Regions:
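Extended alpha-helical scaffold regions
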Residues: 2-235
């Protein structure tokens, strides 16, 4: 007995409706927003408990954030709107599209990574430098996804690195190292300046990191210097 072959119309899956596509997109954005909010809570907890592992968890999610930075930049704008006021809000929103408007609070899913300690996170102002550094980092990542925004990314990242160095908080070490990495990336992508024009600043950052026993930034700067010496033959 041979089974009757299915017709092509029977094999084909029913096409996804436009409404389903919109619903899926809304769900993805809501999930992205929930992860962003959770990450800010982790940063606050990192300061409250003096535990760098919470910041490390936030940084580990950066590849996912980076993949969707351009498509969901309006979600990041909503986080900026919720988190900051005054000059910092204006500084960040000028680089982003209009904020995303959730359909309803009930439709915003919570990420599975949420744990019971989320409710014990301190007030936002206690972790403000860490949250600001993280959101600036995300905005820089978004700007780097657009070649025409390289100058804006460089300016914002440079300012963020300066603020991290000036604040001298150990809870900022991991985020500061990431900002230094993306600052070097900005210069590498610049056809005029290149990484060699950042050499003096990198050497200054290395000295500061060594004095503060900031191993994260020190390692990042050393890698950038070695890359500059090898690739650009700038000694």
């Amino acid at each position: 007995y041979h089974a009757r072959p299915l017709r092509s119309s029977e094999n084909a899956m029913p096409p996804e409706t436009k409404a389903d596509e919109v619903a899926a997109r809304v769900h993805d954005k809501a999930q992205y927003l929930a992860i962003l909010r959770h990450n800010t809570q982790l940063l606050q907890r990192s300061v409250a408990h003096v535990e760098q592992r919470y910041t490390a968890r936030v940084v580990r999610s950066l590849p996912y954030m980076r993949r969707h930075a351009q498509a969901w930049a309006d979600v990041l704008a909503l986080l900026v709107n919720e988190t900051f006021k005054g000059a910092h809000r204006e500084e960040l929103l000028v680089h982003l599209p209009p904020p995303y408007k959730p359909v309803s609070a009930a439709e915003e899913p919570q990420p599975e990574a949420m744990d019971e300690e989320a409710s014990t996170a301190p007030a936002a102002d206690e972790a403000f430098p860490e949250v600001l550094a993280y959101v600036r980092l995300l905005v820089v990542v978004y700007l780097l996804s657009q070649p025409s925004s390289l100058a804006q990314a460089t300016s914002l990242c440079s300012k963020a690195v300066d603020d991290v160095v000036q604040q001298n908080r150990r809870s900022l070490d991991i985020l500061g190292a990431k900002l230094v990495y993306f600052l070097t990336r900005c210069y590498e992508l610049n056809k005029d300046d290149k990484l060699s024009s950042l050499r003096d600043r990198l050497l200054a950052l290395q000295r500061t990191a060594s004095l503060r026993h900031d191993s994260e930034t020190n390692a990042t700067v050393q890698k950038a210097l070695r890359r500059m010496y090898r690739v650009q033959d700038n000694l």
